[in-house]
Amino acid sequence: MALIVGSFAGIELKYIPYKGGKAATLAGLQGEVDIAGGGVHEHVDLVRAGELRNLQQTGTKDITLDNGAVMPTVGNFLPDIKPFLPIGGTYNFIVKRDTDPEVLNEIKEAFVAAAQSDGFKEMMDKKFFQLDIRTGEEADKRAAQLETVTVDTFNRHIPGSL
């Protein structure tokens, strides 16, 4: 994610792979790196405690913490990135393309209902995820968009990595 944001900002970042955002966040906390990327849910406690400063997050909207601190969306600073937000973790439900349309519709209805359930919304709020339900062609288009941006970014910044 940091490389994608850096690419839109026109700045060079040295990519250092970690096994997840929590490990990257700890690397930032320990001074191994100057900028660390990860999911908001992976570093929000350190932001609340004043151990880390959040510069931006890759959701579509600003996030206001219970203490009033605002974690701004990167879209506030880089308007060109807005069509690609949110960038980050997704929950997907995948089926074969030749699945019967009636079955697809039943799955879609169940998936949307589950994603809109109180329990799922509570989990999303707790982890600061933003609900963005896409199905069918809209989901295909979004997946292709994110894949294209990711591949292009990695090819430019880390040639031969993919």
Model regions: which residues?
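Short, highly charged low-complexity linear segments
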Residues: 33-34, 61, 88, 146-154
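Ligand-binding pocket segment of bilobal, Venus flytrap-like solute-binding proteins
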Residues: 1-71
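Hinge/capping helix and adjacent helix->loop/strand transition within the periplasmic-binding protein
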Residues: 1-24, 74, 90-123
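Solvent-exposed, flexible loop/coil residues
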Residues: 22, 78, 135-137
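C-terminal lobe and pocket-closing loops
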Residues: 43-115
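Phosphate-coordinating loops and pocket residues in cytosolic domains that bind phosphorylated ligands
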Residues: 30, 76, 125-126
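An extracytoplasmic/periplasmic, membrane-proximal ligand-sensing/linker region
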Residues: 48, 102-162
